A protein has these predicted regions:
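Positively charged n-region of N-terminal signal peptides that target proteins for export
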Residues: 1-7
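Bacterial N-terminal signal peptides
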Residues: 8-19
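Sec/Tat signal peptide C-region and signal peptidase I cleavage site
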Residues: 19-25
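N-terminal segment of the mature folded domain
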Residues: 25-153, 302, 331
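Short beta-strand->loop
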Residues: 31-33, 125-127, 145-171, 185-189, ...
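Short helix-loop capping/hinge motifs at secondary-structure junctions, enriched
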Residues: 128-134, 153, 166-174, 252-260
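Ligand-binding pocket segment of bilobal, Venus flytrap-like solute-binding proteins
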Residues: 171-237
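Extracellular/periplasmic juxtamembrane helices and adjacent flexible linkers that interface
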Residues: 253-335
């Protein structure tokens, strides 16, 4: 009798575990950068529906947002991210190098160097553009108040800095002149927020500053929410191609048993549906058909890449943004 009861109890446990695993794929944590909240709210809902229809399993996707550099540090320090979707490749490189949680060749996991969408850097100004800001040169004039986040913590801020440096390098022809230009720009910055969304709040809600140097997607979102009666977008003559990458954090996903779902989640970003969601949230899609559909949404701008002008992220981070680097020297000299 006892043996029969034991067999029956074991049968119930196995049955429960079978149906539990068939009904849920568990929980994913996406550690992302600051202004992607709206994007991933929509992606997460769409992917959960897609996965349920495909597998019958329910999945819960949680998200953490903040300055890209801070988010990378949090993962290195123990935040259990199944996937990371950060502002720039260096931050994921740092996770790989300092924690060993994903391989050094992580950018080979997905197409386009694991960058499913792109963006660039533009200016957001107040209605009527009262300070007549047209290009980067206008930002270094006396009396201009610029809002941009801190490059030590924010990925978007690093793109802002590099866009300004690249403009000056192309126009004035030397690293010395570019450094002088960027120094003048930061003299006009009254406050450095931790992340890009914080800077948007400073400019839009706290009404500080004449111009916000911003992710294109963040500027377009602000224009959509506030309307032309509040803000306008100014597209500079030249800017940088910003490529925010994605990666599965392999060792954490393996430990959680979420590797399959984590990979599928990031692959979803490359599908027609995922690309449509990116475009609706003002990120430039990679898929040609979707890019053509939304071409009118994105202004034409001459773009350079970090590899072309700066030699890639490893060199750029070490020279400009590491402790004691060029940014620290510039900021120390003006404060």
């Amino acid at each position: 009798m006892k043996s029969s009861l034991l067999v029956y109890a074991l049968f119930l446990v196995i049955t429960f575990l079978f149906y539990s695993s068939a009904g849920t794929a568990g929980t994913l944590l996406n550690v992302s950068y600051d202004p992607t909240r709206e994007l991933y709210q929509e992606v997460n809902t769409a992917f959960a529906k897609f996965w349920k229809e495909k597998t019958g399993q329910e999945v819960t996707i949680q998200a953490s947002h903040g300055g890209s550099g801070k988010q990378a540090r949090a993962v290195i320090d123990g935040l259990d991210a199944d996937v990371v979707t950060l502002a720039l490749a260096y931050d994921i490189n740092a996770i790989s190098e300092k924690s060993g949680l994903l391989p050094k060749n992580w950018q080979k996991q997905f197409p386009d160097n694991s960058t499913p969408y792109t963006s660039t850097i533009v200016f957001l100004v107040r209605k009527g553009n009262p300070k007549h800001i047209r290009d980067w040169d206008d930002l270094v004039k006396d009396g201009i108040s610029i809002i941009t986040p801190n490059p030590k913590t924010s990925g978007g801020a690093r793109w802002n800095y590099l866009a300004a440096w690249g403009f000056a390098l192309k126009k004035y022809g030397s690293e010395g002149k570019a450094r002088e230009f960027v120094s003048k720009l930061y003299r006009n910055v009254p406050v450095l927020d931790v992340g890009a969304r914080g800077s948007t709040i400073t400019f839009v809600q706290r009404n500080i500053g004449d111009v916000l140097i911003a992710w294109e997607n963040e500027a377009l979102l602000s224009l959509k929410e506030l309307g032309k009666e509040k803000v306008e977008i100014v597209v500079p003559s030249v800017s940088i191609l910003a490529e925010p990458p994605v990666a599965v954090v392999d060792k954490i996903a393996e430990r959680h048993g979420t590797t399959k779902i984590a990979k599928a989640y990031l692959e979803f970003l490359y599908t027609a549906e995922g690309q449509e969601i990116a475009a609706r949230n003002f990120y430039r899609p990679r898929l040609p058909d979707v890019a053509a559909k939304y071409a009118g949404q994105f202004p034409k701008v001459a773009l350079f890449t970090i590899d072309e002008v700066f030699g890639g992220w490893q060199k750029t981070q070490a020279g400009h943004f590491s402790d004691g680097g060029v940014f620290d020297e510039i900021y120390k000299g003006i404060r």
